[in-house]
């Protein structure tokens, strides 16, 4: 599994994971960096994972879905661009052949979720959006969830 950090805005990253043929992105606040990366690599976007509703994590979702037909998964308790598959704590999403566990990590937003895979090429991987964000209100329960991993 390959992971690429795509810079977005002045201080964000959009995470692109791929297996050499298929890709998924996490929290695409801007479609353009993702579309450029897909074009330059020839990858097919199959999945979009969203951790919370803030525009710097969702503004590119609709354009990417329309351009690629990718399936969108996001937190059930947040306003994610429709259509998307709503997720709750304990759900599992399979994308790129990986089972991603959904963790409820409220704090930065009330419905914030994280995506956890216990074994990506022998190592765990967590996409927690802005759960661990130094300049924002956070909630200790969310941190406890992440620490328990």
Where are these regions (language model features)?
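Extreme N-terminal starter segment of soluble prokaryotic enzymes
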Residues: 1-3
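Active-site HxH/HxHxD metal-binding segment of metal-dependent hydrolases
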Residues: 9-10, 23, 28-104, 118-119, ...
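Short beta-strand scaffold segments in enzyme catalytic cores
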Residues: 14-16, 113-115
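Conserved G/P- and acidic residue-centered "switch" motifs that form tight phosphate/ATP-binding loops
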Residues: 52, 108, 130
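Short active-site segment of divalent metal-dependent hydrolases/proteases
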Residues: 55, 59, 111, 133-134
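Ligand/cofactor pocket segment of small-molecule handling proteins
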Residues: 104, 111-114
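Internal catalytic or translocation cores that form aromatic/hydrophobic pockets or channels
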Residues: 127, 132-133, 137
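Conserved small/polar residues in nucleotide/adenosyl-binding loops
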Residues: 138-145
């Amino acid at each position: 599994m390959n992971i690429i950090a795509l810079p977005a805005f002045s201080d964000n990253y959009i995470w692109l994971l791929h297996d050499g043929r298929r890709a998924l992105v996490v929290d695409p606040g801007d479609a353009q960096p993702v579309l450029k990366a897909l074009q330059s690599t020839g990858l097919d976007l199959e999945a979009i994972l969203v951790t919370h509703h803030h525009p710097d994590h969702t503004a590119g979702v609709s354009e990417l879905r329309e351009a690629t037909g990718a399936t969108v998964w996001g937190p059930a308790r947040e306003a994610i661009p429709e259509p998307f598959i709503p997720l709750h704590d304990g759900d599992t999403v399979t994308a790129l052949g990986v089972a991603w566990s959904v963790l409820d990590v409220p704090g930065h937003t009330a419905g914030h979720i994280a995506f956890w895979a216990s074994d990506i090429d022998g190592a765990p991987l967590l996409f927690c959006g802005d759960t661990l964000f130094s300049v924002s209100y956070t909630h200790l329960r969310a941190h406890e969830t992440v620490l328990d991993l």
